[in-house]
Swiss-Prot record:
Role description: A three-component membrane-bound flavoenzyme that catalyzes the formation of hydrogen cyanide, a secondary metabolite, by transfer of electrons to a cyanide-resistant branch of the aerobic respiratory chain. Contributes to suppression of black root rot of tobacco.
Main location: membrane
Entry GO MF terms: glycine dehydrogenase (cyanide-forming) activity
Enzyme Commission number, as recorded: 1.4.99.5
Record InterPro entries: BFD-like_2Fe2S-bd_dom (IPR007419), BFD-like_2Fe2S-bd_dom_sf (IPR041854), FAD/NAD-bd_sf (IPR036188), FAD/NAD-binding_dom (IPR023753), Metab_Enz_Cyan_OpOx_G3PDH (IPR051691), Opine_Oxase_asu/HCN_bsu (IPR017224)
Species annotation: Pseudomonas protegens (strain DSM 19095 / LMG 27888 / CFBP 6595 / CHA0)
Protein name: Hydrogen cyanide synthase subunit HcnB
Catalytic activity reported: glycine + 2 A = hydrogen cyanide + 2 AH2 + CO2
Enzyme class: oxidoreductase
Quaternary structure note: Heterotrimer of HcnA, HcnB and HcnC.
Induction statement: Transcriptionally up-regulated by Anr in response to Fe(3+) in oxygen-limiting conditions. Stimulated by glycine.
CDD domains cross-referenced by the UniProt entry: GlpA-like_Fer2_BFD-like (cd19946)
Keyword entries, A-Z: Cell membrane, Membrane, Oxidoreductase
């Protein structure tokens, strides 16, 4: 085989896959849209010399190890930073917008898609105000070591990322006004035994809770955001206790002064490219679309592999293991490893992965979102920020008989902006599933290009050149 395996995505999954290939003497091409490798989890500071001690010693150790391992094998990896894959031509080549903003075609014989995920946006009144941010984006901001959010900060949502970011913000010098976990404490406690599958992560969680208590940062379980208010920017956040299905009790609502509100309700796999390639997909219990893969991380096209969050949200450590398994499949396809040798290594990775998946299952169960979340937006709340589609528009379409995402798109123009539904697909899917009682209501279908391409990216035609001579 003459062409390098191509890896799309330079996060932990893509980096681990490239390392595994390099360890066996196989060169690869790694395409990453950011200016640094590592993804959202392990990208590190944007400037050299910036210390990230406030992120904790264990994180800094894992960050250094991943980048150190990669540096040891970098001579075997063709790294293309600031390069975006904007489309696919079948399952043999990709269309790339490179760092010079020129369109290129990249052919491959084997491909690993490790495109990661994006945050689930949950609309509520005031969510478009300046100062309201997604939690993962806020964490990436402090990980960059360059810019910190304005204080005080309120954190709301569900999941282990809430206390983690609260601790990191406080340690970096940012004032945290409170953390509001939508799930009740009892629901989390029921999953404590399963979470012991990863003892260190469980202990890390307890350590974070102790840190918040020591520094007087309120962590309230069974509470969530109701509304964000302000004139030109955020100034007040309204929170309230939630019922078991996340219905807010407005009689007990509280208003909190804040300049930043960070909301985090989990993540959704980035399947735009895998959809465009025509690969098979399925729906998770949480309602998001994910690409289907077998035990070798092979998609419905055996030479196209999936790694990391493409097949489901499982975290950075699991992403690295899935990337290595995908690389083993390629090594087997290229005849570098025998089936027996590849299987033996895969089983070793799977043993590590099993405990992570049991831990992750517990997290997924306690962070399961309640039906009341869909009712948070008022009628005039914007759902699709690109097309200014409101909840009233969506409710009108449902009353007219809309049953799936494609019909909703035609009636309301949701997802027709540049982001292609990344911001609104979660809510639209939730509302359609609630209204129809169906698990599969379709998904936003991506269109080419996946990201905008400047006109300057295209070379002038011969006719245009002759007209200017």
């Amino acid at each position: 085989m003459s062409l390098n395996p191509v890896i799309v995505g330079g996060g932990p999954a893509g980096m681990a896959a490239a390392i595994e290939l390099a360890e066996h003497g196989v060169r690869s091409t790694l395409i990453e849209e950011a200016s640094r490798l590592g993804g959202v989890v392990y990208r590190g500071p944007l400037r050299d010399g910036v210390q990230l001690d406030y992120l904790g010693p264990r994180y800094c150790e894992m960050l250094a190890k991943l980048h150190g391992d990669f540096a040891d094998h970098e001579q075997m990896i063709d790294v293309r930073l600031n390069s975006r894959v904007v489309g696919a031509e079948g399952t043999q080549s990709l269309v790339l917008l490179d760092g010079e903003e020129q369109v290129q075609q990249v052919s491959y014989e084997q491909l690993i898609l490790a495109a990661g995920c994006h945050e689930r946006s949950v609309p509520f009144p005031g969510w478009t105000l300046p100062g309201v941010k997604l939690l993962g984006g806020l964490q990436l901001q402090i990980k960059s070591g360059v810019v910190k959010p304005q204080s005080p900060v309120v954190i709301a949502g569900t999941g282990p990322l809430l206390p983690l970011v609260a601790c990191q913000l406080h340690a970096s010098g940012v004032r945290v006004a409170g953390v509001y976990e939508a799930c009740a404490l009892g629901k989390i406690a029921k999953q404590s035994l399963a979470m012991l599958n990863k003892p260190q992560l469980f202990l890390d969680g307890l350590s974070m809770l102790a840190y918040l208590k020591l520094h007087g940062i309120a962590l309230r379980y069974g509470w969530g955001v109701v509304e964000a208010q302000g004139q030109d920017a955020l100034s007040v956040v309204t929170v309230a206790p939630y019922s078991s299905d996340w219905q807010p009790d407005m009689a007990k609502a509280q208003r909190i002064a804040a300049q930043t509100l960070a909301v985090g309700y989990g993540f959704i796999p980035r399947t735009q490219l895998s959809q465009q390639m025509g690969l098979e997909h399925n729906f998770s219990d949480d309602g998001y679309l994910r690409a289907s893969a077998n035990a070798w991380q092979q998609s419905s096209e055996p030479h196209v592999h999936l790694a990391g969050d493409m097949g489901g949200i499982r975290g950075g450590e699991a992403a690295m293991l899935s990337g290595r398994i995908a690389a083993l499949s390629i090594l087997m396809q290229r005849g570098v490893l025998s089936n027996e040798a590849a299987l033996q290594r895969r089983q070793g990775y799977e043993r590590k992965l099993a405990s992570i998946l049991r831990f992750r299952g517990a997290v997924d169960r306690y962070t399961a979102r309640g039906a009341g979340q869909v009712e948070l937006p008022k009628g005039d709340t914007v759902i699709c920020r690109c097309e200014h589609t409101t909840r009233n528009d969506i409710e009108r379409a449902l009353s007219q008989g809309v049953q799936d995402m494609a019909s909703l798109k035609m009636r309301t123009r949701v997802s027709m902006g540049d982001c292609q539904g990344r911001m609104c697909v979660g809510y639209c899917s939730d509302r359609l599933r609630q209204a129809t009682g169906r698990k599969d209501v379709g998904w936003i279908r991506p269109r080419f290009p996946l990201d905008p391409i400047p006109f300057s990216a295209f070379p002038p035609s011969d006719q245009e050149v002759s007209q200017h001579d």
